[in-house]
Amino acid sequence: MKTRRLFSLLAAAALLACLLLAPSGAPRAAGAPGAAGEFTVMATTFPVWLFTRAVCEDVPGVRVELFVPAQTGCPHDFTPSPADLNRLAAARAIVINGLGLEGFLAQPLRALDKEHAVIDASRGTHPLPAPDGDDGHGHGHGHEHGAPGVNPHIFAGPAQAALMVRAIAEGLGRRDPAHAAAFAANAEKAAARMEGLSAELADIGKTAPRKGIVLQHDDLAYLAHEAGLETVAVLRAGDEGSTLSASRLNALARRLKAEKPVLIAGEPPAPDRAVELLSSESGVPFALLDTASSGPADAAPDYYERVMADNIQTLRRYFDVP
């Protein structure tokens, strides 16, 4: 499987090199990104696409496309095809999450960034350390698909999302100066909404009588952090599989019985078996929290805000916050 993926990536990189060497005035296929004078922006992942759409809302002549399919979630297993990289090379700007989340695109992005086309949405954000082991604390080992020692899922916290939309607007303004003011104005409106959500999250930790939480995956760490909650354990970090050994499950269950966290947070569409078993063994309830890492291809403009508002209501209910 790894050999096949490597071959696919090498072939795609070769195609991309050919595309980059083509004359800048070479014709593009009808309907391809950048056709008919459009300023096409390619967003790598679903949350980055949501944020980029908000920045580009009602800006004439600008089209935002999504690179990784909307339902993919965390993209570390995604292998782009030659056709995918054709789309990428045709875009006028490429917006990435950054922090190594798009490791599968490292070589193509380096080639494209020679034209300053790549916009890193993580610039100016404050990433959390990557967790290591069941204690949920960062010890600097990082993700296979992220920057060393860093949790790359910054999109999952509204305060960081606000910084991301501002970084996107700044980068797009450099690529398309004629619309820089419109990008900046849209970003400030979106950032204000996200900062409002972050303030609501912070209120939970200020008033909750108990604050312990267990996370199914480390992307939920940003929600827990902004809510002022105390992460007792992280069941899965980075590319780790979701299966817990019986001995690890029993040890975690004993620990949770002793520490009595309020909630085990799983992820939609349903918690994995480890979450259900741990909840059953420890007596700690579980609920689903959505980081908006994936979603519908026709997501509404306020999709991110609605998802985060639902998360806030769930946390308020379990942490006894009115």
Model-derived features: positions:
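Bacterial N-terminal signal peptides
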Residues: 10-23
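Twin-arginine (Tat) signal peptide motif
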Residues: 3-7
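Extracytoplasmic metal-acquisition and chelation regions
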Residues: 2, 23-322
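General helical structural elements
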Residues: 8-9, 32
